[in-house]
Amino acid sequence: MALDLPLSDFRKMAVEEFDTKKLLAHARKQSIDRGYDKFPIIDVDSHHYEMESFHEILEFMDDPVLRQLAMSAAMTAGAKGNGVMPGGVGYQDMGGRVTRYPLRKIEKGDAGEHRDVSLTKRWMDAMGIDVAVMFPSPMLQLGLHPQVEVEVELARAYNRWLCEKVLSQEPRIRSMLYLPFNDPEASYKMVQEFGGKPGVVGFMVTSARFRPVQHNAYMKTYALIEEMNLPLAFHAGYNWNEQSMGMMNRFISVHAIGFVFYNMVHLTNWVINALPERFPKLRTIWIESGLAWLPFMMQRLDNEYMMRSSEAPGLRKLPSEYMRDMFYSSQPMEMTDMAALECTFRMIKAETQLLYSSDYPHWDFDLPSTIYDLPFVSEEGKRNILGGNAIRAFNIKLPEKKLARVA
């Protein structure tokens, strides 16, 4: 099947097929040249486009009324599932220049396995990734759904579908499952149901939402995740419909600020309300916010705390010290000023706390070379960031012989 790409009024392109392996040929060459086969590489934040399997996912909904409403809306609206999922305004394909956005739809999977498994393995093999932690894409907006019951039903359906259709087929693919955070009791039950499933390495809260993480209703969920020795992640996102973000008139602006803003709010509440003291063994991961905001937060919170420590009586040390014990995903790593980046690495103890993430197949993804080629990180530090830290954060056990990759 050919797909016409409307690149401009003057130039059009008809594409007969799309192959991830060809797209990432240079990434494959990098992985060979740099010898990635000599140490584990774990990608803690990759994505798939679950809307391309949306009708499959809806079959896993329990509520027959909501299932019928969702199926009808999805059938009417098409693959994006508009009418079911909250809309996210944005121009991630940069006016058609990032061609894999439309072209991925015509890429075929391999016989005998789910298409999501095939496509994921192709980019993993090209980049030299041993294990990838997979997240949804449009569903990162699900926390903004006006109907809490719909968020809960879709979250449970997606989690069940992912475990049965994807994670069970390929041990190299793992996931931190979606928690419907607008319903604290449903979140708790989600951890109970899925905490021991194969391929589940933790749980994830989408950050673009308006529920305070310090609310007492979530304490038993945090306690259960801690008891299971699993990490909890806050995955960043943006919401252009939010009033303060609506003042920005360009996608570049809301993408730059939105992906940082919500995690800044949640991390502040997490630290100031002493949740690291209440759950000292619960590992927290802050995903897809980049790194440049962290020195600012450390300095800002420390400065306020030194003047008003009575308002954070549960803390036993500076906010920055709690932050240095947390984990952070690397992408999108701000590399415009190497001196500033080196300072950031030092402040967050990157060699033990930073986790490599690609964010593939999103438009601003980072290859492992983003970490491997840094001039100021030791060889041991690079290997820690690319895989060793994730093994510790997720308790991932790799076989003695590294997982085979396609040559």
Where are these regions (language model features)?
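Mid-to-C-terminal alpha-helical segments outside catalytic/metal-binding sites
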Residues: A2-P40, H55-V131, R160-S168, K189-Q192, ...
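Divalent metal-dependent hydrolysis catalytic cores, especially in the metallo-beta-lactamase
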Residues: I41, S46-H47, L103-D110, K121, ...
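Flexible loop residues that form catalytic
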Residues: H47, S137, A208, G237-Y238, ...
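Active-site metal-binding loops of divalent metal-dependent hydrolases
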Residues: S46-H47, D359-P361
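Short glycine-enriched, charge-decorated loop/helix-capping segments at active-site entrances
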Residues: Q147-V152, T370-D373
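Catalytic pocket-lining loop regions of alpha/beta-barrel enzymes
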Residues: L3-D4, E153, V166-R174, L179, ...
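Short catalytic/ligand-binding loop motif for oxyanion handling, primarily in non-cytosolic enzymes
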Residues: Y49-E52, I57, V131-M134, L140-H145, ...
